[in-house]
Amino acid sequence: MKAASKSGVKLCLKLLALAVKVDRDPSLGFLAYLTTFTNDRESEIRKNVDLIQTFKMANPVIGVVHLLPLPSSARWQGDFQAVIARAEQEATALASGGAHGLIVENFFDAPFPKSQVDPAVVSAMSIIVQRLKHLVTIPIGINVLRNDARSALAIATCTRVSFIRVNVLTGVMATDQGVIEGKAHELMRYRRELGSDVKVLADVLVKHASPLGSPNLTTAVEDTIHRGLADGIILSGWATGRPPNLEELELARAAAGDTPVFVGSGANWDNVGELMRHADGAIVSSSLKRKGKIEEPIDPVRVRQFVTALAQGVANRDSAASGNGAVSYPTVAV
């Protein structure tokens, strides 16, 4: 069933649940129920429209293509064709396994510069992204580590792909590359200068880093969205392969409002159903690789298992919210 059809079915179920409640207690004003329901529904629609426009579905699985070391990095091996071949293999595995999008990331370039990367990295990633565009049809995003959002936006705009990931868009984080300051004002002005419609997915309190000062997750989420102008937010665990805390994910979901929330690390087919109770999508890599090992290539069978598990988690979440006593409405008479 298509996403739009599923959405219509859920809408009908919720309206039916409303009618049953009012029939049982006529003193509860139906218009009050309907007004509250409509506001919630409009919020859900706005969020889903943004995701569907980008990923062609409301709860996407976004796999990550970890590029082998690129030219100028400390572990560069001198064979760019091997880098391209591995990237093509992993993109194909993601697409054939049913992923709804992918991020191209210079993961194996560590140790990273904290801001601007070498021009050779920008050139190499541009070539690879262009190759992948002609190989797969799923949306492509870019993350230039550790935090070269400007280069990521330039590559994405010139290659005409859909989105970028930014590790530090707002705030100040202490990282193994040093202190990194978010530069949302520079990035968003640059996006305007380029006339770009590339979406910006931004980490909040990113992994492998600690915020300077007293961290407040709710404030960080709100600042990233309303002051940093992020199109979506990402919540990760403390490191690659570690899931976010469920309570923190719930707080982030509440603070984000209409803005999509993605799980940014640690999701696997055992925990993704629980994580999706408070998220709109998942960015995943480690658990998709052979034997779950970060250095191994992506396995399309593991991709399919993950996509199936996430879809089941979303179905369970939506079923629980569709009227079986899980949805409550204010008792305000009109």
List PLM regions with ranges:
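Glycine-rich, proline-tolerant flexible connector loops at the mouths of alpha/beta enzymes
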Residues: 101-124, 171-175, 234-243, 292
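N-terminal small/glycine-rich loop or linker at the start of catalytic domains
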Residues: 52-79, 193-209
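Glycine-rich phosphate-binding active-site loops on the catalytic face of alpha/beta enzymes
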Residues: 162-177, 234-239, 265, 279-299
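Hydrophobic faces of well-ordered beta-strands that scaffold small-molecule active sites
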Residues: 61-65, 104, 140-144, 166, ...
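Catalytic cores of alpha/beta
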Residues: 147-159, 267-281
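Conserved anion-binding
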Residues: 157-230
